């Protein structure tokens, strides 16, 4: 397959899926979108509009099982992922799965076990920060060791507003899941425990939600990571990370772009949501995944990484309720992911 174009099927045509449809069609080389599956036919048709020969289906499994589909991008809600991932693994085709891998560690482990039984790493989880130039530079800086050993990390994850139906638990599973993955990826070690504190809540939070929250992550070597998660901050989208090391600090996610100076004031703009902030990361992620998928593999976060993130999320949700430090329950890493 490596010498011909990758025929991609997209499952899920919502905000993220439709964005990926445009990305694959316009900006990813060596790949073409041949099918879109979504229970909402009109939504699937909108995502496929203008793409010659792209078929639409209301049954996502038909996309995965189609003989002319070489690989799949999965952008449906997390609760639907497990059967779709298992179908892709059974067919032996690579799949890029938007986070989360699944909503809980037990179902994530079943996906891992299916891959282990197949003997191939076919599932890549869409943790796009690994492909962001700033985060990649931070990873290289920490790995080089010039700043000494990492001691602390401080993170902030802010959204202008949460969508309808967004819950406190989703602050962990849909938002802080990214910090769980970047912590493991940047530091190269597992998360051992999670704590959650609830400061004074914004008046903009919907009934039943405490926002913001402060999450503390503990790693195997003793590094502490603080995460401010604020999903109704009101002013825009920000993601920041500062690593505090023995010999210095390194920070990513600062304000950038054009600034203006007028009438005695200076200022700039804040991204309205995640898409402009991480467009380059999404493009790089999809391109590298497509290149790897043409050779039958992946190039990014594995199913095991998704399973480890799910275990950390479960500890985080438990800590939200109990207020106590909650250990992360994670099985031993299978040899396939060594």
Curated annotation (Swiss-Prot):
Highest taxon listed in the record's lineage: Bacteria
SUPFAM superfamilies referenced in this protein's UniProt entry, alphabetically: Glyceraldehyde-3-phosphate dehydrogenase-like, C-terminal domain, NAD(P)-binding Rossmann-fold domains
Entry's EC annotation: 1.1.1.18
Coiled-coil blocks: none
InterPro entries the UniProt entry points to: Gfo-Idh-MocA_inositol_DH, Gfo/Idh/MocA-like_OxRdtase_N, GFO_IDH_MocA-like_dom, MI/DCI_dehydrogenase, NAD(P)-bd_dom_sf
Pfam family, one: GFO_IDH_MocA
Key words, A-Z: NAD, Oxidoreductase
GO biological process: inositol catabolic process
Gene Ontology molecular function: inositol 2-dehydrogenase (NAD+) activity; nucleotide binding
Classification via Gene3D superfamilies: Dihydrodipicolinate Reductase, domain 2, NAD(P)-binding Rossmann-like Domain
Catalyzed reactions per annotation: myo-inositol + NAD(+) = scyllo-inosose + NADH + H(+)
Function text: Involved in the oxidation of myo-inositol (MI) to 2-keto-myo-inositol (2KMI or 2-inosose).
Assembly mode: Homotetramer.
Family indicated by similarity: Belongs to the Gfo/Idh/MocA family.
Name of the featured protein: Inositol 2-dehydrogenase 4
């Amino acid at each position: 397959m490596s010498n011909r174009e990758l025929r991609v099927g997209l499952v899920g045509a919502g905000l993220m899926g439709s964005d990926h449809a445009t990305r694959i069609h316009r900006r990813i080389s060596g790949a073409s979108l041949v099918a879109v599956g979504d229970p909402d036919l009109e939504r699937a048709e909108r995502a496929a509009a203008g793409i010659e020969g792209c078929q639409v289906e209301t049954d996502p499994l038909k996309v995965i099982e189609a003989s002319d589909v070489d690989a799949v991008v999965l952008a449906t809600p997390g609760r639907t992922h497990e059967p779709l991932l298992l179908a892709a693994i059974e067919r032996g085709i690579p799949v890029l799965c938007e986070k989360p891998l699944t909503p809980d560690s037990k179902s994530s482990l079943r996906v891992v076990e299916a891959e282990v039984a197949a003997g191939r790493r076919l599932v890549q989880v869409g943790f796009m920060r690994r492909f962001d130039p700033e985060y990649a530079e931070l990873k290289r800086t920490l790995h080089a060791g010039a700043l000494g050993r990492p001691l602390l990390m401080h993170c902030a994850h802010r959204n202008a507003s949460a969508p309808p139906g967004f819950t406190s638990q989703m602050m962990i599973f849909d938002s802080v899941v990214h910090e769980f993955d970047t912590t493991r990826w940047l530091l190269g070690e597992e998360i051992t425990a999670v704590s959650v504190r609830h400061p004074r809540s914004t008046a903009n939070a919907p009934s039943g939600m405490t926002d913001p929250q402060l999450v503390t992550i503990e790693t195997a070597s003793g590094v502490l990571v603080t995460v401010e998660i604020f999903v109704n901050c009101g002013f825009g989208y920000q993601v920041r990370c500062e690593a505090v090391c023995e010999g210095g600090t390194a920070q990513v996610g600062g304000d950038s772009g054009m600034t203006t100076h007028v009438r005695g004031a200076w200022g700039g703009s804040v991204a309205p949501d995640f898409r402009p902030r991480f467009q380059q990361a999404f493009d790089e992620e999809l391109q590298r995944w497509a290149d790897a998928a043409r050779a039958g593999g992946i190039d990014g976060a594995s199913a095991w990484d998704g399973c480890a993130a799910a275990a950390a999320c479960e500890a985080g949700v438990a800590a939200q309720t109990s207020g106590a430090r909650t250990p992360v329950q994670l099985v031993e890493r299978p040899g396939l992911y060594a």
